[in-house]
Amino acid sequence: MILNVNTEIFEEFLGDYTGFFTGSFIAKKKKLNQKTTSNYLQDLEKKGILKSKTQGKNKNYFLNLENKEIVKNFILAIEHLRTIEFYEKNLVIKEISEKIKEHIKGSALIFGSYAKGTQKKDSDLDIFIIGGCNENEIEKISNLYNIEINLKVYSKFKKDILTKEAIKNHIFIKNAEQIIEEILNDNY
């Protein structure tokens, strides 16, 4: 297992780049030790990845968007680890992802039940694409594996409900850096 407690703590920020989170909220949600969580958040703040604001008794942490290059690279590293972990648990989806990447121009991520880890045997595979793709070739791959692939294709990044849903729970499969930069630049 590549992911560790520190990765779990930081994952909360990956679904909402403008979110504010307390250590106690993250610890409770992830079922982690409060002190461990607090120490790691403080460490990320010292490294310039997070900032904090105290409101009452609560210390709210958020991404340090004034330090975009460091934050982007840290997010990218964590996202790559999450993708590896996902592929270790979902070998068939890894194969499908490898095959469909050839037919995607731009960026792509998995969202929906597979990204949340709630998929069932008959779940479809939701793919969010910014750019373009060869839908006919992807449909052939879908038929080959007998898994319905549901494509959501945007020619360019745009803020809407679907984008927000895809960002909230996702696994990057192609050009993660491009989407991360779009999100960071739009403060989304």
What annotation goes with each model-predicted range?
Residues M1-H103, A115-K121, G131-Y188:
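Catalytic core of pol beta-like nucleotidyltransferases
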Residues G106:
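Short coil/turn segments at beta-strand junctions that form active-site/ligand-binding loops
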Residues F111-S113:
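Glycine-rich beta-strand-to-loop/alpha-helix junction loops that act as flexible
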